[in-house]
UniProtKB/Swiss-Prot annotation:
Residues 19-1126 are extracellular. It is a single-pass type I membrane protein. Pfam families: Cys_rich_FGFR. Residues 1148-1160 are cytoplasmic. This is Golgi apparatus protein 1. It comes from Cricetulus griseus.
Amino acid sequence: MFRLSAALQLLLLAATGAQNNHGQVQVPGANIGPLLGQAEGGSPAGQQLLQLSQQQKQPPQQQQQQQPAFPAGGPPARRGGAGPGGTGGGWKLAEEESCREDVTRVCPKHTWSNNLAVLECLQDVREPENEISSDCNHLLWNYKLNLTTDPKFESVAREVCKSTISEIKECAEEPVGKGYMVSCLVDHRGNITEYQCHQYITKMTAIIFSDYRLICGFMDDCKNDINLLKCGSIRLGEKDAHSQGEVVSCLEKGLVKEAEEKEPKIQVSELCKKAILRVAELSSDDFHLDRHLYFACRDDRERFCENTQAGEGRVYKCLFNHKFEESMSEKCREALTTRQKLIAQDYKVSYSLAKSCKSDLKKYRCNVENLPRSREARLSYLLMCLESAVHRGRQVSSECQGEMLDYRRMLMEDFSLSPEIILSCRGEIEHHCSGLHRKGRTLHCLMKVIRGEKGNLGMNCQQALQTLIQETDPGADYRIDRALNEACESVIQTACKHIRSGDPMILSCLMEHLYTEKMVEDCEHRLLELQYFISRDWKLDPVLYRKCQGDASRLCHTHGWNETSELMPPGAVFSCLYRHAYRTEEQGRRLSRECRAEVQRILHQRAMDVKLDPALQDKCLIDLGKWCSEKTETGQELECLQDHLDDLAVECRDIVGNLTELESEDIQIEALLMRACEPIIQNFCHDVADNQIDSGDLMECLIQNKHQKDMNEKCAIGVTHFQLVQMKDFRFSYKFKMACKEDVLKLCPNIKKKVDVVICLSTTVRNDTLQEAKEHRVSLKCRKQLRVEELEMTEDIRLEPDLYEACKSDIRGYCSTVQYGNAQIIECLKENKKQLSTRCHQKVFKLQETEMMDPELDYTLMRVCKQMIKRFCPEADSKTMLQCLKQNKNSELMDPKCKQMITKRQITQNTDYRLNPVLRKACKADIPKFCHGILTKAKDDSELEGQVISCLKLRYADQRLSSDCEDQIRIIIQESALDYRLDPQLQLHCSDEIANLCAEEAAAQEQTGQVEECLKVNLLKIRTELCKKEVLNMLKESKADIFVDPVLHTACALDIKHHCAAITPGRGRQMSCLMEALEDKRVRLQPECKKRLNDRIEMWSYAAKVAPADGFSDLAMQVMTSPSKNYILSVISGSICILFLIGLMCGRITKRVTRELKDR
């Protein structure tokens, strides 16, 4: 009977994956009534069938030539009233003595007069309390056998199905009188369009499928297999005859078990396989025809699918949908699973799938003619072939797509429907995932294991899972993955409610909300488990595939959707795409705009988890275990790898480096950082954030606004971390790399670290500037970006690795409570400079020297004085910024904090002339001339504690400096006269005196020269010679110019205006004018001025007496003015005379020689 067409096996395998079918199979009773009704009403098919069933004038007799292999037994004994002499219009089953009691007990009275209705009623009885007697069973068996082989029934079939038979050549050629005609029509039932013929054959099918022995040819094909699998142990006798459906069920289980074993002990023969699958196909529309499943699930059908209309496989689908309900009986669940496994082997076992997709299978050549026999009917191939058409943009009917969705969901829901999973993952399932068989939990458990969260999985199992994910394609519709669907339902309802249900962008939306408050933990796990596989096959992201398939084919040499290349590693195509996504126009071969946007979207989403980057996880697995085993929180693993970049294996380092380089161009890849920085981006960087092409602008903006009030800790830490990573390689700063690439190759070859490149380039720029080179070696665009990088590095000591390494121990010792950032650590080190270790001290000194030459690099000064710079120095050059601020320091509009910071920098400058570039330039001739002795003792990179400046101050008092140097020293003297802290030598030598004699003045918030005045007044109380010398030097300086004596200048300001306005300031001219005015009795000075002048005269007089001689002239003057002048002169004269006398008396010391020897 069953000459299997080649297409059947292909459709079979596909059905294994569908888990949520809603169709149901027609129950025989559903059609019998109408047919009989039509028989009474006059339908030819109905009348003839009814008449035939009633025209059996005698009970069915045993026909030896047609007995099946397992005979039903001898004919029943003739009972009264059942023979030809029976009443009514012919022989009736209900009147047979052997069945009368059973019919009366089981069947409704209105069916008794119709043999087919009685037959249907009795053969569907399975309850123990209603069990049919053995004699009645035997009678029914022979009656059905006669029906299937009776030539009269065949003649009815030929009449009712005349046009159908002419269309189906196979049936027209069947021999007459052997029952093959009806069997052939049953075989082609799906192709019968004639209504009456279809109804007739449906009735006959119900009779034939009630017992495997009635299926023509089935016994011949499966006899040996029945014995081999021991499926024939169910004998007729006391048991229900209709349990013969168990034999077919047993064979089906043997068939699916064989597919799940590597080396099956028992193999079903090919002929029997075809027969089993064909029986399953023919019972696909009416679940009543699968006798084992019908009896196993009859109660469950009433419970779950009571309102489901029978026919076209709807009952099957409804039961599939409820397979994992708690109240589903275990025997029904097992029967449904077996049915689903058969669908996986032959898609035609699913009536609705085969019917809905028939035209599409033919249209896209997914049918028999194109494929090797082993694959043609498998559900997996059908799904892959049709999904490939969908992904290529071809039209597949909505009915077919709906069926595909159901069966893809079915495969994802129950791992046991995929023989490859059972074969390859049996050990892993037993070890890691036992007891998780329902609702897709086992598959997700295996996914979790593969992600490395619970152990390792074999490659075969991993490959089987990857294949299953491709077959089911849950990336196209999240609902296919039931475990994910249930876990993420709440998130979808809140975060993704604006997206249509089933849209592929739902998964994208979930990824965007990963690690947010809206995400729930269970959804997070299920999502990452699925994304792990999607990330390894670019085709599994339908939006990416649709928009990039052209680019992938052109640039990455990809295959079709359902073709794979074993030579291509996981994630290789996507890696290829993102390499081309960030190419410039000059580099060529770029992606289309749509594809580029998709690649960026996925990059942004997947960067949150290293496991979603196959190449990264593969190459860095050892390094992750070695360096980052404790970094388990979100995003920490990649940060950890970046932190240990120099320690990583070469392959891992290259991948991490490339990814970091990519991040520098498009920082939005750092999705967690972007999420943390969202408020700052919205407030300060929305312009650059909206740009489709980032090119490093967004990170630059975040760095510039890192210390805004709105900045949160997570964002600041993230930005700083990225800055620290950038220091490891100049390629990690995209804008710097693009602006200076050529300059680095030319001027700084073989230099990798960013800080070294910055130093190299900035040194070149500085040298060219100092040497006033006609043309800078560093290009203009590079110089501009170099300035940005230099400014960014000043913000955090960690961004200057050499300084940081040199000062680590000092930071722990003196700045342990100070936070990084805002240059706070650097400022702390400056304040504790005297206590620093030698190496750190030298580095800090070098830093200060650089900052004084270029104040814009002084982050703290620029930050504190930002508004004052805008107010007072908007036009000032970066190198003259501090000079400008100093000039406006005493303005009433000057901010106190900025003024304090300027004073700090002045104090620093006055500790060493090298920290004052203006002074250094103005006095470059004077310093070696007058202070050579100090310079010879000085060491590089250590302060001179103001010795050179003190030396120049003394020469200023003697009016011996050059005019430029004199101007600068005058400013320094004026400033230090107002604030003692600006005189390092005074601070150094008079610290005890200030603390003891002038504590109140020193504590004043505003320094206006009170401390200096206090020291002058208390000069006689000072015991320390060095301090006394410093005070005397101050007095000497003030004598040179009134401007350097703020107290005196303030007291005499009006007098200078009235009496000395015409006198040019400088070189003591105005001071001399005031002294003359004091001596002139005609001039009346202000009382305060007069008092201060008299005090100064006394001080100068005392200073002249006690001050040490600076030179020979000073020494001669001191002798001449000394009260012991005569005594000193006498001693000197006597000494000379004694020396002369000794010479006369002792003669020459050298030996006499002749003139000749002298002249020789």
